Amino acid sequence: MSVVETVLVALALGCDAFAVGMGVGTRFCNPRQIFRLSFHFGLFQMMMPIAGWFVGSRAADLVSTWGPWISFALLLFIGGKMAYESFRSLEAEDGECPDPTKGSSLVMLSVATSMDALGVGFSFGILGQQLFLSAVWIGITAGIMTWGAMRLGNRLSRQFGRRMETVGGLILVAIAVKLLLF
């Protein structure tokens, strides 16, 4: 695979990370949160192709069957929770919304946004493609896209107010639904 093809694959895989990062950035955008989400999304996007490559093509059917459902469930849960919490915090302005850049929410988001990368790893294994360099490109690209998306989400939130938090949660729900339909 050429460098251009590798970069295009990395950009395509980073789109989910970008969308989720923008949704999270509407509420959570201090430097530590940006680092945590960008680092973990990049790390998971890098490690999932490696895991997929090692597991091999025998389980490719399983991932292609259940991967979208797993991602759907994780994104629906976290997006719904974000939207619900933002409605609650709009009603009680002192309400605290849980930080999705920490703990189990961070791991679930990282897994959900990197399931496609697992499938790419299977493909690389089947085709005998160079894995390490491609995985590094994929991880770096996802991390950078997440960083930019969180900054953009935060800027939109400052311009349009607290309702952008609800939009952020609904973006995650929309991505979850898209995974099942397309």
Swiss-Prot record:
The keyword Chloroplast appears for this protein: no
Subcellular location: Cell inner membrane
GO cellular component, one term: plasma membrane
Residue ranges that the Swiss-Prot or TrEMBL entry lists as coiled coil: none
Topology within the bilayer: Multi-pass membrane protein
Pfam family, one: Mntp
InterPro entries on file: Mntp/YtaF (IPR003810), Put_MntP (IPR022929)
Transmembrane segments: 6-26, 37-57, 59-79, 104-126, 131-149, 164-181
Protein's UniProt keywords contain Nucleotide-binding: no
Keywords for the protein's UniProt record, in alphabetical order: Cell inner membrane, Cell membrane, Ion transport, Manganese, Membrane, Transmembrane, Transmembrane helix, Transport
One GO molecular-function entry: manganese ion transmembrane transporter activity
PANTHER family noted in UniProt: MANGANESE EFFLUX PUMP MNTP-RELATED
Family that this chain belongs to: Belongs to the MntP (TC 9.B.29) family.
Function: Probably functions as a manganese efflux pump.
Stated name of the protein: Putative manganese efflux pump MntP
UniProt organism field: Syntrophobacter fumaroxidans (strain DSM 10017 / MPOB)
Taxonomy of the source species: Bacteria, Pseudomonadati, Thermodesulfobacteriota, Syntrophobacteria, Syntrophobacterales
